[in-house]
């Protein structure tokens, strides 16, 4: 029965792991709902300011903010939003694949790259992969604050204003639904007018007290809001991916337990049959 004992031990071990993954699934469900609420609360502001900025990109203001001016691209910056923890399926891996592909296109064109990394997984990836990380922040927790991001974002904005980078993009996972998280690369600056806005409307604004003072503040708030929204959505995507990963792990553990239980029963039956045969053989010999 040595084989049966070993199988029994494996079954007990897998059942213990199954309890852990099941508990983690339930925790992820709760955290995902809270993350979705935060995402829904911040999304209207992020979308509205994006619309206003889109109108500005099509307008002809008396003051052209540096974020509104296209220039030859020699160096680009990425704000990479990753998670702090693992056990969330291929969420970070898919994000890094998308980013590396975009970086490869830039490098083929002779464009250099600077990185601002949000999240421990992103920092660990670029330590191994290589890259010029100029700013990093991690351990934002389950309720990230925009105040925690301002310092890192400012590093990239200052680099753009000083002419050290010519384009800034944010890389993150978009929360589509519970089953789908989409890695995206979105250009933040210089501003990009959406085609629909460009075709249908041309907007002009009156600025008070003056265009420079208003736009200087608005442009910074725009970038900060988009990065914060990316962090909040990535957090919701992380919890959804973790919930699915833990559910799959729990289900797979159940299937493995069933298979091992069948093997155990067969091994036990074979051992009993052998014992009976030995008893019968011994009785016949007597």
UniProtKB/Swiss-Prot annotation:
Gene responsible for this protein: atpG
Main location: membrane
PROSITE patterns: ATPASE_GAMMA
Purpose of the protein: Produces ATP from ADP in the presence of a proton gradient across the membrane. The gamma chain is believed to be important in regulating ATPase activity and the flow of protons through the CF(0) complex.
Compartmental location: Cell inner membrane
Subunit structure: F-type ATPases have 2 components, CF(1) - the catalytic core - and CF(0) - the membrane proton channel. CF(1) has five subunits: alpha(3), beta(3), gamma(1), delta(1), epsilon(1). CF(0) has three main subunits: a, b and c.
Organism: Pseudomonas savastanoi pv. phaseolicola (strain 1448A / Race 6)
Keywords annotated in UniProt: ATP synthesis, Cell inner membrane, Cell membrane, CF(1), Hydrogen ion transport, Ion transport, Membrane, Transport
Entry similarity comment: Belongs to the ATPase gamma chain family.
Regions crossing the membrane: none
Source organism, top-level taxon: Bacteria
Annotated protein name in UniProt: ATP synthase gamma chain
MF annotations from Gene Ontology: ATP binding; proton-transporting ATP synthase activity, rotational mechanism
């Amino acid at each position: 029965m040595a084989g049966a004992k070993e199988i029994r031990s494996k079954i007990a071990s897998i059942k213990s792991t199954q309890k852990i993954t099941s508990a983690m699934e339930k925790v992820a469900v709760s955290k995902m709902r809270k993350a979705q609420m935060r995402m829904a609360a911040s999304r209207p502001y992020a979308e509205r300011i994006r619309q206003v900025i889109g109108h500005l990109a099509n307008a002809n203001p008396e003051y052209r903010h540096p974020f509104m001016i296209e220039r030859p691209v020699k160096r680009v910056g990425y704000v990479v939003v990753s998670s702090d923890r693992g056990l969330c399926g291929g969420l970070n891996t898919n994000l890094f694949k998308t980013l590396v592909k975009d970086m490869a296109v830039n490098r083929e064109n002779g464009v250099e790259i600077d990185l601002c990394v949000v999240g421990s997984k992103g920092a660990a990836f670029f330590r191994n992969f290589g890259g010029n990380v100029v700013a990093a922040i991690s351990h934002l927790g389950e309720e990230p604050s925009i105040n925690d991001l301002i310092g890192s974002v400012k590093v990239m904005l200052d680099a753009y204003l000083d002419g050290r980078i010519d384009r800034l993009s944010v890389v993150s996972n978009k929360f589509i639904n519970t089953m789908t998280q989409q890695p995206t690369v979105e250009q933040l600056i210089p501003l990009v007018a959406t085609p629909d806005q460009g075709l249908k409307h041309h907007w002009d604004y009156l600025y008070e007290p003056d265009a420079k003072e208003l736009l200087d503040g608005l442009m910074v708030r725009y970038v900060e809001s988009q990065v914060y929204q990316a962090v909040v959505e990535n957090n919701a995507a992380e919890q959804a991916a973790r919930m699915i990963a833990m559910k799959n792990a729990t289900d797979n553990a159940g299937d493995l337990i069933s298979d091992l239980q069948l093997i155990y029963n067969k091994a036990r039956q074979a051992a009993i049959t052998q014992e009976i045969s030995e008893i019968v053989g011994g009785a016949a010999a007597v």
